[in-house]
From Swiss-Prot:
Record GO biological process: mRNA splicing, via spliceosome; single strand break repair
Naturally occurring in which organism (per UniProt): Drosophila melanogaster
Protein name: Aprataxin-like protein
Chief subcellular location: nucleus
SMART domains the record matches: ZnF_C2H2
Positions with biased composition (Gly residues): 570-582
Length: 662
């Protein structure tokens, strides 16, 4: 890569970037020709200004905005900079120069360096922007004109001094940097350590000059303070800082908020503070108050009584601004006693008092400097929310944190309550929409319980239940009457094929009694729960699990799976007709059901055992003449009657053991 492509390499390194955006970046010049020299480069591959057209005007605006940002970041004045492009650039990639006017640098070594920034070879940003907007292109300078401009004499950019050579010019520029006033006046005063007689003015300009650096430092501090005071004026030129904008004022956030919520309503008219207002500016105050109420309404779960709205009597900024600040004063920027006193003493004038004084008196008088200094350092510090008093700001901030934490808990609780109320209102709205419209001659249909709707989602409102659905409805009502606070587990997620909500997510609550494990020869079997209505109904077409020859025999005390947990469908249970009074569904009692099943299975197993013994004797007589073979494993099981379920008594006897299973 050649030296002309060095800029492309520099912007690819993150450590070189001062400011970056999605469109352009800012870097420092490797060979600065002044104390401040920065380059603003676009990320798009644009070789030079000769490749620009009207479509790049927005790009130029972005480059100019970044140039202003880097000047503000460095804390220097914008008017002390030259911003523009080289008419004959030597480096590839379009770049905007942001260079200070002092030109005091060791990298300023040749006459070409000076003339490239202080002649027509340097095209200001505004001039290039206007030419591009008018002509849609930038043309090159003729070579003869370029050579003529490079050969121009070295003329100071801050006065009419003409230097014989570059060293004399650099010495003259150092004098301008040390004292912003005229250098010629300082030369006439002379120097007590260096004789000036016999020397020309141009030769004395670059001599060492022992000036009063204390006065210079003091002047620089004053200039810096004035620059900071104009911060609000600069923010008015950048619309990205605006939260709310109108034709007379804007709302923006405070750079160093003294509370959790701190906004400024800045007037666009040039008034320094409230002492310059008269009765004619009352409509302006009304408009600023309206904007303050708008920004307060945008803060959720925070009422207007928690805000202070007013002006500072002796403001720091050179622009009229109305403070809108929450009264918690919980902020890291609250660092000094003067910060607290500026909002909690007579230094802060509420909006109502300022408005009344302008209405009655027509003006507001400023306070004296002595009174202002005394109020700034006033002690003890009193809490604005209780009677707490202390002399240390750190103790006050710790106390204010407790108030803030309590209010935050109340706001969180209020948010939760509002959310619950909103959910309830939405549920009521959905029920109102689902309710059918009443005809003129029809009576209103009584609303059905939620449990019935959940169990029978396909049931239309107003349609009577079938005899098969009535027991299930009555059973569901009895269950939910006992479980007022809800079931112990999510009953809507039980693996019942008749349950339309069986695929819904679980409530992450475990059952108090886990289900009995069902293991088979090929792994665990899927759990089975029978329907909740009586057996032998047309809706129950699910095949119950029958005999499995590959399954290991059950223990003698076990009779098989329980098919119908409903007490009405177990042997001997009464099945009432729809509409008859039925008792509530009995609770599960493992010992009672187990003993009942054993008694039923013992009665049913006796005739089955007699039939099986007869079948086995016939099989043995038919196989006497055959060669004896080892019986297969499945024929060496216990009698079939011990593993059949409750419905085995109604089936045909089992086939002989030497026949193939169906």
């Amino acid at each position: 890569m050649s030296w002309s492509s060095a800029l492309i390499k520099d912007i690819s390194k993150p450590e070189n970037l001062i400011i970056s955006s999605e469109i352009a970046v800012v870097i420092a010049d490797k060979f600065p020709k002044a104390q401040h020299h920065y380059l603003v480069l676009p990320l798009a591959d644009i070789p030079s200004i000769f490749h620009l057209n009207r479509s790049h005007l927005s790009l130029l605006e972005e480059l100019h905005l970044l140039a202003r940002n880097v000047v503000e970041v460095k804390g220097v004045r914008w008017q002390d900079f030259n911003v523009g492009f080289h008419a004959e650039p030597s480096m590839q990639r379009l770049h905007l120069h942001v260079i200070s006017k002092d030109f005091v640098s060791t990298s300023l070594k040749t006459k070409k360096h000076w003339n490239s920034f202080n002649t027509e070879l340097f095209v200001p940003y505004t001039k290039l922007y206007a030419q591009l907007e008018k002509e849609n292109s930038i043309s090159r300078l003729p070579k003869s004109l370029k050579d003529e401009l490079l050969a121009k004499p070295l003329i100071c950019n801050q006065c009419e001094f003409v230097a014989r050579n570059l060293p004399s010019l650099k010495g003259h520029l150092v004098g301008h940097l040390q004292d912003p006033k005229s250098v010629c006046q300082r030369v006439r005063l002379g120097n007590q350590f260096f004789p000036t007689a016999g020397y020309r003015t141009s030769e004395l300009a670059y001599c060492f000059d022992f000036v009063d650096f204390y006065e210079y430092k003091k002047q620089m501090e004053v200039d810096k303070l004035a620059y900071i005071r104009d911060e609000l004026q600069r923010k008015l030129n950048d619309k990205r800082n605006f939260l709310i904008e109108s034709d007379r004022a804007v709302v923006m956030k405070a750079d160093y908020p003294k509370s959790q919520y701190h906004f400024r309503v800045v007037a666009k008219e040039e008034f320094r503070d409230i002492t310059q207002l008269t009765e004619a500016q009352l409509p302006l105050l009304d408009h600023m108050m309206d904007l303050a109420n708008q920004i307060i309404e945008k803060q959720k779960h925070l009422e207007s009584r928690n805000f202070l709205i007013g002006f500072k009597v002796n403001t720091f900024w050179n622009r009229l601004n109305l403070h809108v600040i929450s009264n918690d004063f919980y902020s890291m920027a609250m660092k000094r006693i003067s910060h607290w006193n500026s909002f909690n003493t007579e230094l802060f004038m509420p909006f109502q008092i300022a408005y009344m004084m302008l209405s009655v008196q027509g003006s507001i008088e400023s306070i004296s400097e002595e009174t202002y200094n005394n109020l700034q350092e006033k002690t003890p510090l009193r809490c604005n929310q209780c009677e707490f008093v202390t002399n240390m700001l750190l103790d006050l901030k710790a106390h204010l944190y407790q108030h803030w934490q309590r209010k935050e808990d109340e706001r969180d609780q209020k948010k939760k309550v509002d959310k619950i109320i909103q959910m309830i209102s939405e549920t009521k709205l959905d029920e109102a929409e689902a309710k059918p419209k009443l005809l003129n001659e029809e009576e209103p249909i009584q609303a059905q319980p939620v449990a019935a709707i959940a169990q029978y989602p396909n049931e239309h409102l107003g349609k009577p239940l079938t005899p098969q659905q009535q027991p299930g409805k009555q059973q569901a009502q009895n269950v939910y009457d006992k479980n007022i606070n809800g079931p112990s587990v999510n009953m809507m997620n039980q693996n019942n094929p008749n349950n339309p909500f069986r695929n819904t997510p679980h409530l992450n609550r475990q059952s108090q009694k886990p289900p009995h494990p069902r293991s088979g020869p090929r792994g665990p079997m899927a759990p089975w729960t029978g329907p909740r209505f009586p057996c032998h109904q047309q809706q129950n077409r699910f095949r119950p699990p029958g005999f499995n020859a590959c399954r290991q025999p059950y223990p003698p005390y076990h009779s098989g799976h329980q098919q119908f947990p409903n007490a009405s469908s177990v042997g001997g249970g009464q099945t009432g007709l729809p509409g008859q009074g039925q008792g509530p569904r009995p609770k599960w009692n493992s010992n009672k059901i187990f003993n009942q099943q054993n008694r039923q299975n013992t009665v049913q197993a006796q005739p089955q055992a007699q039939n099986q013994q007869t079948n086995q004797q016939q099989i043995q007589n038919s196989n006497k003449n055959q060669t004896p073979k080892k019986k297969p494993w499945k024929n060496r099981l216990q009698p079939v009657g011990k593993v059949q379920n409750q419905g085995g008594a109604n089936r045909d006897p089992a086939p002989p053991s030497n026949s193939k299973p169906s």
